[in-house]
Amino acid sequence: MRVSRVTPFLADLGSGKNLCFVKVETDGGPHGWGECYTQADRDTSIVALVEAIGRYLVGRDAGHITHFVHWAYHDFAAKRGAMDFWSAVSGLEQALWDIAGKRHRVPVHELLGGPCRDRVRVYANGWYGGAKTPGEYAARARDTVGRGFDALKFDPFPGPWRTHITRAAEEQAVANVAAVREAVGAEVDLLIEVHRRLAPMHAVRIAREMERFRPFLYEEPVSSSNLEALAECRRQIAIPVVTGEELYTRAEFRRVFELRAADIVNPDVCNCGGILELRAIAQMAEPSLVTVSPHNYNSTTVGLAATLHVSAAIPNFLITEYFVNFEARGREIATPPFEVKAGHIAVPVRPGLGIELDESALARFPARASTGRAMPTPGDEAP
């Protein structure tokens, strides 16, 4: 069964960035869907790479998934990967797994050794958009818990993202966390997102202030581009530290485990190299007693489906990400939609990834040329 066509779809589903889906067709067999991670205003380069790599994928056996990733990196990219490249590869790799599952009439997790669980715990993200004050964070948190979520992730810091911030910014972040904890009670897990922004001096001081609110985790307090600094931060605080969303493939995760720089890793199936690579990273983490919380700043459709299958198949899974603000549009473009019940999603049981996209629905959401973001001026910078 050989690949006959590769088609990327770029769509603006109102998520603040364009989303990139990939359809891989075969000569007389099933087709497959994948999703590539994107960032705001960094999507057309990923589409271009999908098209360029796709030209070499056409004519090849759709079942040769491991070899596809091997030659894409070693030969197409000449061993020079980056976010855009690995995002393109990840989407294509997922589509090949979707084809494999459909071909063998089993869900993808059965091809990964079978499930370790029948449902996957998720935390809500995207629920606090526009919140600036503690009261606004608290109100949005109560609403989200009212929808059935028992874990909330949020970035409590004022912008812009900077390595060194003022005491006032530190205090505002702590106040926002305090307000959310008071609003939702002690039983809801709070996941604190830092977005790689801080130097250890800030990250440690803030974490110690937040410890009394019992955060579930502290995500990327320091960039993984400086793992020694991240490890320094981890050693000084009592909140589990997460890293991984800016790392790609096993090669980049190796030193996380060697340095014991994190308690939890959060690779993203849409940019870490795909389904097999996410599982391989989880397997590396397990003997180091590190758990896995897959990042999923993707749609609630294909990217989520791929995440669910890997999450089902790895023993050291913890929790994964679900963007509540992507949910409504996701239901318009995909069938069947995933349902969150009591903070969990049932592991898909249909063949392949277990989800199909509607191309006519995607056409109703053309991509935006630019998000029109406001970039900071010198006057926006802290002293």
Please place each PLM-identified region on the residue numbering.
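Glycine-rich, aromatic-flanked loop segments that form ligand/cofactor-binding clefts
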Residues: E93-G130
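Glycine-rich phosphate/pyrophosphate-binding beta-alpha loops
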Residues: L10-L13, E35-D43, V89, N125-G129, ...
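Conserved, mostly hydrophobic/aromatic
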Residues: V3, G29, I53, L92, ...
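N-terminal metal-binding scaffold of metallo-dependent hydrolase/deaminase domains
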Residues: M1-E25, W33-T38
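Metal- or metallocofactor-binding catalytic centers and their adjacent structured scaffolds
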Residues: D27-R103
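Metal-dependent enolase-superfamily TIM-barrel catalytic cores that perform enediolate-based chemistry
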Residues: R119, N125-E232, Q236-I237
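Flexible C-terminal active-site loop/helix
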Residues: S4, P8-G14, D27, S299-P383
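Shared catalytic-loop signature of beta/alpha-barrel
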Residues: T44, A48-I53, H67, R208, ...
